[in-house]
A protein has these predicted regions:
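Class I SAM-dependent methyltransferase SAM/SAH-binding core
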Residues: 90, 94-146
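Conserved class I S-adenosyl-L-methionine
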Residues: 185-212
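Bacterial N-terminal signal peptides that target proteins for export
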Residues: 2-13
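A short glycine-rich, Lys/Arg-flanked "PGG" loop and its adjoining helix->strand segment in the class I
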Residues: 170-185
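A short SAM/SAH-binding and catalytic strip from SAM-dependent methyltransferases
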Residues: 155-170
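A short acidic, Gly/Pro-enriched loop at the edge of an enzyme's catalytic core
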Residues: 147-156
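Core SAM-dependent methyltransferase catalytic element
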Residues: 218, 224-242
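Class I SAM-dependent transferase core
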Residues: 26-84, 88
Length: 242
């Protein structure tokens, strides 16, 4: 074989190796394990955690229950979000917009993208926008594998009591990491999995250790943890950058 053919053969082998790496998918520790579902979970495991069932739009009234502000101190939650007036914020798993609208008052020169995978929830948000005249909340249909947000387009994303339901947490996490600007932050609010006294089903809670493991696998740093709420962690993760 002459030198030219040898070079071409080696280049072909290199390209084949690169190609196989590119299509190999996520690293081994972020692969999913599938088993039979049970009463609480879908039978899909991610980094040792079983993913819970999704609460559908039929549960919208529970999200808006009158006791929620006192039970969860949602006022403290909103006040704890590290926001600036001109931020573009994504409320992931926005549901009825329970948090989207009060957060919008904290970013008067910015906007809140209320992202949900259920069109019925977005219809509720659209109705609330029309009734209230709010101009800086935008409903956005997300997917189970992507939040459908542009790259480097948001300053902060927050997820309240929903991340544990994501059927594709690795892919969704990648999408959020890419959507955040350098230095942007992801705020994860989850019921404390370490606390047996929190009256929530096991798979609807998460420990700070588990959340940190999953977010760091995506490239985030953190978490900075604020335990100012009666039942939930506030976990702040940062995308490296400015």
């Amino acid at each position: 074989m002459n030198i030219t053919l040898q070079v071409r053969a080696r280049l072909g082998l290199i390209l084949l190796v690169i190609s196989s790496i590119c299509v190999a998918g996520p690293p081994a520790e972020t692969q999913y394990r599938i088993t039979a579902p049970d009463r609480e979970g879908i039978g899909k495991f991610y980094m040792g955690r079983q993913i819970s069932y999704v609460m559908g739009h039929q549960g919208a009234s529970w999200l808006e229950r009158g006791s929620r502000r006192v039970e969860e101190r949602t006022d403290l939650l909103i006040a704890s979000l590290p926001l600036e007036a001109d931020f573009v914020v994504a409320d992931i798993g926005a549901g009825t917009g329970y948090f989207s609208f009060p957060v919008a008052t904290r970013v008067p020169q910015g906007r809140v993208l209320a992202v949900d995978i259920q069109p019925e929830m977005l219809e509720i948000i659209s109705s609330r926008i029309a009734q209230s005249g709010t101009t800086n909340v935008e409903p956005l249909l997300g997917g189970v594998q992507s939040p459908n947000l542009a790259i480097n387009s948001i300053d902060l994303a927050f997820i309240v009591d929903a991340y544990h339901e994501f059927s594709h947490p690795f892919e969704m996490g990648q999408g959020l990491f890419e959507a955040l600007k350098p230095g942007g932050q992801l705020v994860l609010i989850e019921y404390r999995g370490e606390d047996a006294s929190v009256p929530i089903k096991r798979l609807h809670k998460m420990t700070a250790q588990q959340a940190g493991k999953e977010m760091r696998a995506l490239g985030f740093t953190g978490p900075d943890m604020l335990d100012v709420l009666p039942q939930q962690h506030i976990l702040i993760f940062t995308k490296p950058g400015e």
